[in-house]
Swiss-Prot record:
It is found in: Plastid, Chloroplast. GO terms for biological process: translation. The gene is rpl23. It holds the Pfam family Ribosomal_L23. It comes from Zygnema circumcarinatum (Green alga). The lineage of its organism: Eukaryota, Viridiplantae, Streptophyta, Zygnematophyceae, Zygnematophycidae. This is Large ribosomal subunit protein uL23c. The keyword Transport does not apply.
Length: 89
């Protein structure tokens, strides 16, 4: 179940969201909000009060004469209780 979370997202927008106690993760496209919520609460010992999710657009990749598509992820924005935090490296 820990395999659902692929990586944390670090860019200008997600750093701004950290001030609001919101953390952004790329997760497996098959993962549901309930599964990710239970995973984050269990692993990090925090209280999740809200979640938003979106599917990232498909990007076409080309290598030589063959073309394909990049792996697609789902992005989750997790809002934590104001007293909780997750250590971000």
């Amino acid at each position: 179940m820990i395999d659902y979370i692929k990586s944390t997202v670090r860019n200008r927008n997600t750093i701004r969201l950290l001030e609001k106690n919101q953390y952004t993760f790329d997760v497996d496209p098959k993962a549901t909000k309930t599964e990710v919520k239970r995973l984050i609460e269990g692993v990090f010992g925090v209280k999740v009060i809200g979640m938003n999710s979106k599917r990232l657009p498909i990007k076409q990749k080309r290598k030589g004469p063959t073309a394909g598509y990049a792996v697609r992820y789902k992005r989750m924005i997790v809002t934590l209780n104001s007293t909780d935090s997750i250590p971000v490296i």
